[in-house]
Structure formats: structure tokens, C-alpha cells
Swiss-Prot record:
Protein's job: Required for the formation of a threonylcarbamoyl group on adenosine at position 37 (t(6)A37) in tRNAs that read codons beginning with adenine. Is involved in the transfer of the threonylcarbamoyl moiety of threonylcarbamoyl-AMP (TC-AMP) to the N6 group of A37, together with TsaE and TsaB. TsaD likely plays a direct catalytic role in this reaction.
Transmembrane segments: none
Cofactor: Fe(2+)
UniProt catalytic activity: L-threonylcarbamoyladenylate + adenosine(37) in tRNA = N(6)-L-threonylcarbamoyladenosine(37) in tRNA + AMP + H(+)
Name used for this protein in its record: tRNA N6-adenosine threonylcarbamoyltransferase
S-S bridge residues: none
A GO cellular-component term linked to this record: cytoplasm
Amino acid sequence: MNILGIETSCDETSAAVLSDGTVRSNVVSSQRCHTDFGGVVPELASREHERLIVSIVEAAITEANIAKNDLDVIAATAGPGLIGAVMVGLCFAEGMAFALGKPFVPVNHVEAHIFSPFISDEPGHKSPDGDFVSLTVSGGHTLLSVVRQNLDYEVIGRTIDDAAGEAFDKTGKMLGLGYPAGPVIDRLARDGDPKFHRFPRALTSSSQTSKSYRGNFDFSFSGLKTSVRTWLEGHDAEFARQHQTDLAASIQDAIVSVLVEKTIAAALLHKVGAVSVAGGVSANSGLRSAMQAACNKHGLDLFIPKATYSTDNAAMIATMAQLMMARGRYRENSYGVAPFARFKAAGKGTR
């Protein structure tokens, strides 16, 4: 079965072909037009998707060495994301499916991230044997979920203000690192001292709210942004520049330690044997290293997608569509689905 996946939820235009569960192509175009604005401009994102969508889809089909008529299913992100951006891919996919007489499957972008560590592009790819705890962490989302084998999942924690990826980008902008700042902080942090300054870790066992921590798996990163700004305002600009790597390491340590602590605590509380980390921030080397060390300490298996599949991509959309169809979560004639901006958990028992 050949599935075409299309992803346009934010600032990546992507199309991929999944053939019998294996990725045959995954074409991604990351928009550079937002750099000068210090963040994604929704209208520009939509226009870029419109400009690129045809060529990206054609490239994915060509790279997979198939014809359009060889496609069996068309899938696309229905949300969450920037509404205008989502609509470009969604409407294109619906129109293509209708024209070819193929089934159309709308996919929840966050659910696709949750299952992205299990994208198969080589033989022997492993998946958890049982339930697992998933940390989905990106510029727009920070979620902790307990995932069941039948695709049901329970969201047990989410950010109450800023997502972790947003915290990376905005604190990096304060340091003058440009946009996106997350990868730059990751690179600088490798040469810095994470103990240079201890920035706050909200809603953790080491924070002032520790009495209410037990069972609280929500996240908060707005205080970190305020703390970084306060530190910069209280120190000479030249001193801050000289210690840029130390500041990057300290910021990264504050974010990563919270993500790791809560994820491991959730895994132990729910007695699962595996943890997965997905989303754009899962590409962060500090997070990968710290999570692996924590999982090794507690005897947990760790699943993280390849860097190619960490950021937004269409291979995860096609993979999620295949999982939905295999487990009966696909409804025939899904045309006309309304795009949505905010995350809607589809699993049972979610909050």
C-alpha cells in the first residue's frame, strides 16, 4: 500500500510516500523567509506553502519511483497548527484524493509526532512491546502522555504557558542568537558550563512548589524567560557576551532537567517499560544525552526519532495514517474535515 503524506502545519512544506510501512521518500522544505522577523509570520507561511506544495508533492512521488495512480491513500495534517498553513496542505490533499478517487485520511499533527520514533525506513526497526510514556516537545507543544498499544493515550501533563521550544527560541533571541535559536543554544551549550547560573525549574521537586509536585506533570517556562531577561538587565553586555556559551548551557540545563525529571517520574508512576521523545526539541543533543542517561539508570527503553523525523515532516503523517487505518480509526469519506489550531486529544481518558 502506498500512502502519500502531506504536512504544512507551520513553516515546513513536506510530502512523503510510505510503501508497505517503509518510507520511500520524505521531501521537506524549511521556510527561511521568517528569519528577519524573529519568528514565524502566519501569512508568509501560508503563501510559501501555496508556492511550494505542488513541486514538493511531485518531488516526493518521483523520488519514491511511483506514479500518482499508484497511490492508495492520501493523508494530510488537519491540525493543530497555523490555520492558514494547515488549510493549504489539507485542501490540496483533499482535492488530490478526490481527483484520483482515493481515500483521504486527516491526521492529528501532535499524534503523528507521538508515533514518529517508530517511523520505519530500514529493516529491524524496533517499537515498544507495551505501553510507554511519550514526551512531545516542540516550539508549539510540550505534552506528556501515557500511550497504549491500541493508539489510545492519556495526556497527563502539558505546558501551562510557553512550550519548551519557544523557551529556547525566545531566550536565545535575548542573547542575540537570531531565529530559530534552539539549535544555536544546543551548539553553544556544548562548550559552556551548565552551572554558571542556576535558572528556575518551575513545577519540579526542586522548585518552591515542590509540595504540590507529586502527580503534577504540567510544565511552565515563562518564569525562565523572565529570569534570563532579569539576569541580562543586571549584567554588563560585554560580560554576557563573554559568557554566551555558559549562559546557553545554563538555559539548556534548566529546560532539559525539567523535561527529563517529569518524563522519568511519569514512567515510574505508570509502571511502563519505555519512554519516547518526539518533536523538534527531541533533536537537542543535551536532551537526548540526559534522557538516555536517566533511562539507563531506571532500566527504561528509550525511543527517539532520527533527526530527520524530529522536526515537522510528512513521513510521520503517512505513518500515522497507516496506524489509524490498521487499528480502525479511519472513517471512510473523510472529506470536508475542519482544520483546527489547537491540540485535540483523540485518545480515551485524555484531559
